[in-house]
């Protein structure tokens, strides 16, 4: 940027069309967050009505994560082939329909299936909205684009918590799911009036349709084998998370089977750059493992361990959700200032100072607990707002929506594991101790994976001929693309 450009406030670098595009995507993400967290808010009520065990109840949260990998793949490929807008609209219809079905669910299995539908829609929303906004904004503002967008999910969670305190005590838990579908008409109308992402239009102008991840996996020479593997992965995940299997050894074998299938899909779709894709899935897996025990089971902790009433639970969740939303925006500024990876590491390190106090002070002082949660979630959860920017930078425009959608949502299976692991540990420890220990220990793993830029580093070790040296979104060099002690300035920029 020139000196003159740098002196202009960042928000003046955006035109009206870019703001309208962001507003539409942000609203969709708010609705996504609203619909997705409803089950966490009413988990104890659903558990009581359906007569579920704690692990079965937690699996209803996990169900949405089980289907996310397939939703990210299919809807991401739709976004790569037909544009980001169509994928966004399809996604929002899916997760809204799933939310309505939850309200009518007569029992556990029906609600589990409805949550699978929500997961597919959520996955498509994440990949398509993130790529849409990031590709619509100027390169030097793309951490802000990512962070601001993801804040919508946390705002949706805050709104859901407030609606929960007003609706559930009067009309019951089913009414909450019926409300979740009402704003969808406005969102769909708004999305019909937004332009396509600039990067996608430039890449596809006058060119033949790209070969998407769906084309490679399900229309190529290995399509039969890939269809069989898809069904095998879906079946294995169903048995792992539907609360039917109690044998840990069988669950471990099925988990390894799924991992092998997902790695196979990544190798087929990314070719020589498969080490990068696999390591990105690992990064996201641990990102969910450290954050989602708190996200999923905090309402249960407040209601059971601290014996808070619905109104107090809503107030505490407001601080938590609002902190995460603010953190997404702060993370966007930090990312554009320090760089994506450095901002991520600094924010997570700061969050570690707060995680133990959050669960150590008990419930005597609601306001102190709320403030601690606000800052812990701002630093620990909010920084995940720039995760789409981090992941998307490893993929070209032609593969970005499916690459981001599949990679992120396979890794998001950590979010399916997290509440179940938390619930299992809580059978031997109190729930607060279980949540604090999981989050504190696994956050350090994420700090190492991102701080050392392990996707680029492992790519350099295993397939150096396909190493990407610079971020495909903002053009900045990857630290892991050079050995320790070498200068990043020596990197030669690769073609996108």
Swiss-Prot record:
This is Sialic acid transporter NanT. Gene3D superfamilies: MFS general substrate transporter like domains (1.20.1250.20). The chain crosses the membrane at residues 22-42, 58-78, 92-112, 116-136, 148-168, 170-190, 224-244, 247-267, 278-298, 313-333, 353-375, 406-426, 431-451. It is found in: Cell inner membrane. CDD domains: MFS_SV2_like. InterPro entries: MFS (IPR011701), MFS_dom (IPR020846), MFS_trans_sf (IPR036259), SA_transporter (IPR004742). Keywords: Cell inner membrane, Cell membrane, Membrane, Sugar transport, Transmembrane, Transmembrane helix, Transport. GO terms for cellular component: plasma membrane. It is a multi-pass membrane protein. It catalyses: N-acetylneuraminate(in) + H(+)(in) = N-acetylneuraminate(out) + H(+)(out). Catalyzes the proton-dependent transport of sialic acid. It holds the Pfam family MFS_1. Belongs to the major facilitator superfamily. Sialate:H(+) symporter (SHS) (TC 2.A.1.12) family. It comes from the Bacteria. One of its GO terms (molecular function) is sialic acid:proton symporter activity.
